[in-house]
Amino acid sequence: MGLTGKTLFITGASRGIGLAIALRAARDGANIAIAAKTATPNPKLSGTIYTAAEEIERAGGKALPLVVDVRDEATVKGALDQTAQKFGGIDIVVNNASAISLTTVADTDMKRFDLMHQINARGTFVVSKWAIPYLEKVANPHILMISPPLFLDLITALPGH
């Protein structure tokens, strides 16, 4: 099954793995909702939802850049609504947005841990929950979960999970 005409709602699609997935789908002629927080350039982070949209359209897809913080339920619902209205539905959700901390458990402050939990667990749940009504309307729906890297050394383990 190709992706021509299929609609993907991808969180964290302004850079990295999310953008790579979007570009690959765009080459097949997919519609891509770029659901990410970065609307203005940041010297520490490459790409914005708008630069991603330009790349997607150059690759052959249709793009909808949306400013979305996956922690904000109303924003997520609104972005899903906009996506379905623009493209006629949603076929695939890619939960890719994440926060990580490249520190040990002992060195990770609780504020950072809470942020990771809010984005990686709650945000993924919120997007999936509110996407289901759209996914139920299509023949072959999918939800793809992308997880941040895990570190399994129990003494110096990273706290992401």
Language-model regions: role of each:
Residues 91-92:
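Short SAM/SAH-binding signature in class I
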Residues 104-105, 109-114:
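Substrate-binding pocket helix/loop in short-chain dehydrogenase/reductase
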Residues 100-103, 153:
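Active-site beta-alpha loop architecture of Rossmann-like, nucleotide-cofactor-dependent enzymes
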Residues 128-129:
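A short, exposed helix-loop element centered on a Lys and neighboring polar residues
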Residues 2-87, 100-101, 111:
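Short-chain dehydrogenase/reductase
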Residues 10-11, 95-98, 141-148:
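Structural signature of the Rossmann-like NAD(P)-dependent dehydrogenase/reductase core
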Residues 136, 142-161:
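Catalytic loop of short-chain dehydrogenase/reductase
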